[in-house]
Amino acid sequence: MRRFLPILLAFTLLTSLAACGAAPSASAGSGGGSSASGSAASSSAASEPEKPQLEPYEISDPKVEPAGGEKDGVPYVAWDGVVEHLFFHPVIAYPELAFDGDAQSNGLDDWMVTVGEYNKILQSVYEKGYILVDMHDIWSESTDASGNPVMVKTTLYVPEGKKPLVLSFDDVNYYPYMLEDGFTYKLIIGDDGLIWTEGKDPQGNEVISQDLDATTILDKFVREHPDFSPFGAKGCFSLTGYCGILGYRTQTEREDTSAAHEANRQKEIEAVKPIIAELKRTGWTFGSHTWGHINLATKSLETVKADTQKWMDEVGSLVGPTNIIFYPHGARPDGDDVKQTGPIFQYLQSQGFQVFASVGISSYSKIKSDTCAVICDRLHPDGTTLRGSDKVLGWYSQFYDARDIIDLSVRPDLGVKWTPKAS
C-alpha cells in the first residue's frame, strides 16, 4: 500500500481553521523578541528605499553533465534512481502559542513541525548526503515513436556520493489564524534585499526574523552550506489562493466586491510582486494547491473548472505558469483512484499540468502510459509521522531518526508509538 489515506484525509481540519479576513499589519522594523535584524523594509514603507546590491545567485541545470565530468574539482555522476521528496506545512515558530490547549492544538500537532524540529531535519538530510534539486528538472516532455507527447524521467548529474532531494511546502499563504497560533504571517524584503518574515512573539511584540519560518531558515541554511544546493534549487511552494499568497491578501471576495476591497487587493498585488521575484531569483518555484484547497476526489468537474480558473487568474497570474499541481488532502481526482485518467484529470492536463503530486509513504512516482503526465507521492514529516510506530519510523530512516527529531518537551502530551532507543 503506497498511500496512507486516513491521516491525509484528516488534514481537512486545517481548511476549516483557515477562515480568511484582513491580516494584521505589523510595522516592519519595530522589532522585538528574537528578531535577527535591527531593521527591514516593510511593503508599506512611506518612501521607496534604495535597492541594495545583491550577491549574484547562480542557478544551473542538473540535466547537463559538467565539462570533463567534474565541476570545481568535484566529480559528477549520472543519477537515475529515486529522487526523494519531503514536504512540509508552515513551521511552528512559537510552540507555546500553537499548543495552548485550544481546539486547534491537536491538529497543529498532527500536521506541523516546530522550528527546532525543522532545523534538525535539514541538518540530518544534509549530513546524510542529500542535495536539493528542482522538482521541475526530474521529468520533461518528449515524444514517442508515433510522435505523441509523453513524459520522460531525466538523468540528473549530481556530485559523486550525493543523493537528490526535492522539498515542497504546502499552504505558504499565511492564513489569518496563524498569527494567533505561533506562526509567522508574511514574507517581506529586508534592507539587505533578502527575504525576511514578520510575526509576533508570545508577548505580542512584532518580530522580523529569518529564524522562524521554513522559507527563510532554508535560505539561511543554503547560504551557510552552499554544497547542499549545488544547482541553486530551494523548494517548491504549493499555493492556494483563497486567502491570497505569501501573506498578501490578493484574493477576490465573493462577500465583498466593494471598490475599497479591490483597491486594497491591488495594493497587495503590487506589494507581493517583488517578493515573488526575489524568491524566483534565489531558486524557489511554484505549484498549484488549487485555489480553494478543494478535495479533487469528490468535487464535480464544473467546480474544478471554476476553481482552476480562479487559481490561474489570482495566483498563476502572479507567480507565473507551472506544470505541477499538489493535491489538497492528498486526494486524487476522479474518485481518488491512482489508475484513473478521468475527466477531471484530463481537464487539469488541458490547463498545463503534467506533474500530479499526492502524499504517501514513499517517494513513489509513475509515468502514465495513456497520457502525458506523471503521478507521484511525497513523504510528510509532521507530528503524525514523528510520533508514529517503528514501521512509520522506517519510512523516514533514510532521512532522520524521528526519535532524535521530535521535541516532546513542547508538544502536547499525546504519547508516541515507537520503541525508545536502547540506553
Task: Enumerate the language-model features and the residues they cover.
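C-terminal active-site subregion of NodB/CE4 polysaccharide deacetylases
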Residues: E48-M135, M151-L167, M178-L179, T285, ...
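Alpha-helical scaffold elements lining the catalytic groove of polysaccharide deacetylases
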Residues: R249-T285, W291-V319, D337
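C-terminal motif of bacterial Sec signal peptides marking the signal peptidase cleavage site
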Residues: S16-A19
